């Protein structure tokens, strides 16, 4: 699960360089990564 989320975040960051990603999606994943780091 952690690997999938890492790949998903990596894809999200790489795609954000080409396409504008809604801030809602970015904030959503930021919260998830914060929860993962916290736990």
From Swiss-Prot:
The keyword DNA repair does not apply. Its main location: mitochondrion. One of its GO terms (cellular component) is mitochondrion. It is found in: Mitochondrion. Keywords: Mitochondrion, Ribonucleoprotein, Ribosomal protein. Transmembrane segments: none annotated. Belongs to the universal ribosomal protein uL16 family. This is Large ribosomal subunit protein uL16m. It comes from Acanthamoeba polyphaga (Amoeba). The lineage of its organism: Eukaryota, Amoebozoa, Discosea, Longamoebia, Centramoebida.
């Amino acid at each position: 699960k952690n690997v999938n989320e890492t790949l998903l975040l990596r894809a999200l960051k790489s795609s954000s360089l080409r396409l504008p990603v809604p801030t809602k999606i970015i904030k959503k994943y930021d919260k998830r990564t914060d929860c993962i780091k916290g736990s």
